[in-house]
């Protein structure tokens, strides 16, 4: 009996620990189910989502299972829901809907049958599953161009969770709302989240906050700071590789590719190719298409990856998202108007109310050179006077507020 309990506990660790992959789980779960059915084992509860708005990319990455989602739904639904208890209420239906969503399917019909189960999830299940369903609904609404409906879905869910004291979910809900701001080009609102709630500590990475780190990198890209975005993403590299986080790796590689592209670093090609190869292996579409207008120019320059059918579907969905959200991750200052390092230094001095002569002395350049740079800066910022340049620079986050 003690041996069975020990084996059962080890199996539970395989099922519950987020750093353990899903290889072998299809065999482990029925074995644990048998022990539970025979009342030879009891298991503690655990979060299947890690407080994230996703089942497929929550406590574990279930990309491998997505390849056989129909078969696994039929054969694993009963044992999975039995093993997980409260955590399993609504899980199977939500999981297959999300799997199909990632593959580019219109899941509005599936959501119509899933949403009525929310009351059951609320009564018999867990808030983790409730957030997963709400998050999937919001994502499907965004994919259909219904950004106002998506915001209402998440704002309403957040208010309910706050009222019930479910505070551990709020940081990821706020990050999701920030992504909606970015989709709609509401950069001031996104910046408010960034300064008040983003982790912003690359020296002390917490992988449980990975959804927030990815959101943080998106804000940095929108603020025209690809270098900052790369610094935010870099600490996640080892985690997504060592823990087989395929979906997270696609997001990380796409965002890194966008940052490199904007830095005119040709290494973006390798990063985007990695993302495409992973997505194509699982037939995922929306994992990449969600980046719409931000990733479209890169895809147009890159040779095709994956089958012709998959690539055609991907490009169609990317263009659809680009049409719905034309300002997503677009920097405040157009790429063609990006300031050179020298111009940025001179802009800081202009905003500090230094004269051209003082700037020439500080930078050790000729006065005529300063005047030329200042003229270029005014043109790029679309202003005529130095005082206007100061206001524009602050609005574009090119200089600190105290200057």
Where are these regions (language model features)?
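Alpha-solenoid helical repeat architecture
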Residues: 2-8, 39-56, 80-96, 121-136, ...
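Helix-turn-helix DNA-binding segment
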Residues: 326-375, 379-381, 388-403
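Structural register within alpha-helical repeat arrays
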Residues: 14, 55-59, 96-98, 137, ...
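Helix-turn-helix repeat elements of alpha-solenoid scaffolds
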Residues: 1, 19-36, 61-77, 102-117, ...
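Flexible inter-repeat linkers and adjacent short helices
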Residues: 1-73, 83, 281-286, 291-311
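Generic long, charged, amphipathic alpha-helical segments
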Residues: 228-251, 325-332
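TPR/TPR-like (Sel1-like) alpha-helical repeat modules
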Residues: 30-34, 268-283, 319
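Residue at a conserved register position within TPR or TPR-like alpha-solenoid repeats
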Residues: 14, 18-19, 100-101, 141, ...
């Amino acid at each position: 009996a003690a041996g069975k309990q020990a084996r059962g506990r080890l199996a539970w660790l395989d099922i519950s620990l987020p750093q353990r992959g899903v290889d072998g789980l299809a065999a482990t779960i029925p074995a644990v189910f048998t022990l539970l059915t025979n009342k030879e084992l009891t298991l503690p509860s655990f979060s299947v989502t890690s407080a994230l708005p996703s089942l497929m990319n929550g406590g574990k990455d279930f990309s491998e299972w997505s390849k056989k989602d129909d078969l696994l739904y039929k054969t694993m639904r009963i044992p999975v829901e039995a093993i997980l208890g409260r955590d399993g209420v609504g899980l199977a239906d939500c999981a297959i809907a999300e799997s199909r969503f990632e593959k580019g399917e219109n899941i509005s019909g599936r959501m119509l049958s899933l949403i009525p189960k929310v009351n059951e999830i609320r009564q018999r299940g867990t808030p983790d599953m409730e957030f997963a369903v709400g998050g999937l609904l919001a994502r499907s609404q965004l994919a259909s161009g219904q950004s106002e409906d998506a915001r209402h879905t998440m704002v309403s869910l957040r208010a309910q969770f706050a009222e019930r004291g479910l505070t551990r979910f709020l940081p990821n809900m706020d990050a999701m709302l920030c992504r909606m701001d970015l989709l709609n080009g509401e950069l001031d609102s996104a910046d408010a989240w960034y300064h008040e709630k983003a982790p912003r500590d690359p020296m002390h990475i917490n992988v449980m906050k990975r959804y927030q780190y990815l959101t943080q990198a998106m804000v940095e890209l929108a603020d025209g700071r690809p270098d900052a975005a790369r610094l935010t993403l870099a600490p996640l590299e080892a985690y997504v590789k060592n823990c087989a986080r395929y979906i997270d790796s696609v997001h990380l590689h796409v965002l890194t590719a966008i940052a490199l592209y904007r830095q005119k670093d040709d290494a973006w090609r390798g990063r985007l190719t990695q993302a495409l190869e992973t997505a194509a292996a699982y037939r995922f579409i929306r994992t990449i298409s969600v980046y719409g207008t931000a990733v479209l120019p890169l895809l147009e320059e890159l040779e095709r990856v994956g089958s012709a059918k998959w690539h055609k579907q991907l490009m169609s969905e990317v263009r659809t998202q680009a049409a719905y959200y034309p300002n997503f991750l677009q920097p405040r200052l157009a790429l063609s108007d990006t300031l050179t390092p020298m111009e940025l230094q001179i802009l800081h001095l202009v905003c500090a109310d230094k004269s051209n002569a003082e700037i020439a002395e500080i930078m050790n350049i000729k006065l005529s050179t300063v005047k030329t740079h200042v003229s270029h800066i005014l043109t790029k910022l679309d202003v005529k006077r130095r005082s206007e340049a100061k206001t524009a620079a602050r609005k574009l986050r090119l200089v600190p507020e105290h200057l």
